[in-house]
């Protein structure tokens, strides 16, 4: 819930050293962060092809799962993994074998989202970084602590009294601000609070604290 990425290269190196598989759930990173090769327009990288490429890693000994529900607003998910493992999963994993086809509407939404990503995704990612940076800088000036040190667009704010969480959520919602509540056991007891998720569609005014 912190909005920070783990030290993926260290975990990947450990997995390869012991011939193990590293399972990575990149629910929020897919579509937002990606390749960094010196040509990207902003700190989030380019292409939005997820955290493995963001850190310049390969899929050797790595299994990545990600979904389209965050960046693409579509009911779709996928697994990226080494080819031999892919063959095994397609024939041996019940959750895949007994699953049905993707709803056509969800598939159409995902395809259109990928086209938007191809055409102007890097510009949207750069804009998202600026919106996030604006919010984080203002919180810092106000002395409001957040665990976000990466600059990624997930900003978690802890409350001094966890019992106020629901009331705070309602207070913000009534004022047109939707946040995700993070109670225990989703987070440790002392870190209960809420999470602000910014998008490229947020305006400069919406990411400014007034």
PLM-predicted stretches and their roles:
Residues 41, 47-48, 135, 175, ...:
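Membrane-embedded alpha-helical bundles of multi-pass transporters/translocases
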Residues 35-88:
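Active-site PLP attachment segment
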Residues 1-19, 34, 163-166, 205:
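Active-site core of PLP-dependent enzymes with the aminotransferase class I/II
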Residues 122-136, 140-176, 186, 190-194, ...:
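Conserved PLP-binding catalytic core of the aspartate aminotransferase-like
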Residues 63, 75-76, 93-102:
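A short glycine-threonine-serine/GTX helix/turn-capping micro-motif
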Residues 65-66, 99-100, 145-150:
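Short beta-strand
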Residues 29:
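Residues immediately C-terminal
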């Amino acid at each position: 819930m912190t909005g920070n990425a783990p030290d993926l290269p260290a975990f990947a190196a450990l997995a390869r050293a012991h011939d193990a598989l590293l399972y990575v759930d990149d629910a929020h990173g897919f579509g937002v962060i990606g390749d960094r090769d010196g040509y990207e327009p902003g700190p989030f990288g380019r292409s939005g092809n997820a955290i493995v490429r963001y850190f310049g890693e390969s899929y050797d000994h790595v299994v990545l799962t990600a979904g389209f529900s965050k960046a693409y607003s579509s009911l779709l998910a996928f697994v990226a993994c080494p080819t031999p493992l892919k063959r095994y999963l397609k024939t041996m994993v019940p959750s895949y074998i007994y699953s049905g086809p993707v709803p056509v509407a969800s598939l159409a939404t995902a395809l259109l989202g990928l086209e938007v990503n191809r055409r102007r995704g890097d510009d949207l990612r750069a804009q998202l970084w600026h919106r996030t940076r604006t919010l984080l800088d203002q919180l810092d000036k106000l002395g409001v602590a957040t665990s976000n040190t990466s600059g990624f667009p997930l900003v978690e704010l802890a409350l001094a009294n966890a019992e106020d969480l629901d009331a705070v959520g309602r207070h913000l919602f009534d004022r047109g601000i939707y946040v995700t509540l993070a109670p225990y056991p989703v987070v440790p007891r002392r870190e209960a609070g809420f999470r602000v998720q910014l998008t490229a569609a947020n305006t400069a005014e919406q990411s400014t604290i007034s």
